[in-house]
């Protein structure tokens, strides 16, 4: 789809039979050529400078002010790379849009003062924020280095599933009836996404380890009928022996899917707590794959 801030230029168009590795730019070029549009592209900085419609109407950067110009997003997410570098997958939806002020476009920036544009997880955090799956600990703080709790991930996965009605009984002695995470934890337990401990507790406020995160996410993937058969060989990691037996399959799957990767060249850190930034990165990768 191609549109300006006031008009639809190219209605949603299906492009099929594309080879693996096709970029947004390839599809952009094809559709514009097919529809009789031309464009100007900045090769060095990899962005669209101007587009001209078949009737001669030309819209370029700065045509409507210093913050105006062409943007693109895929699946409603603004990209942090140029069109040439964004590789598409089946079902991706491309939107090329002209904005009079990019600062006013939802999803172009984050409201958090502790996540700058050069933070390693900025793009992932922004994706989770714009999708409503992760928010800050308050209006201006995301707390990227804060540990995730077990309840937090249950809430995110519950939100990802549309927050269906919960009718099952509460199986845990330490999950109160009226907490912010109650429905999410009960739903996750009912659907085999979480399990508790031998003493009947869930321990919702405990830090979520990376191994536990892998198990929950793998179970969620199975629940949504995603393929969970992939397995990676983890023997090269020096701490592979620290992976609990109950988490081995899930860790192998998560690593094969590039969801949970090494914290450094040699360590998976399976027993370490998962930070909020790491969880944003893991979930962002899962959604993209």
Task: Show which residues each predicted segment covers.
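Loop/turn elements at helix/coil->beta-strand transitions in domains of secreted/extracellular proteins
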Residues: 34-37, 92, 131, 192-193, ...
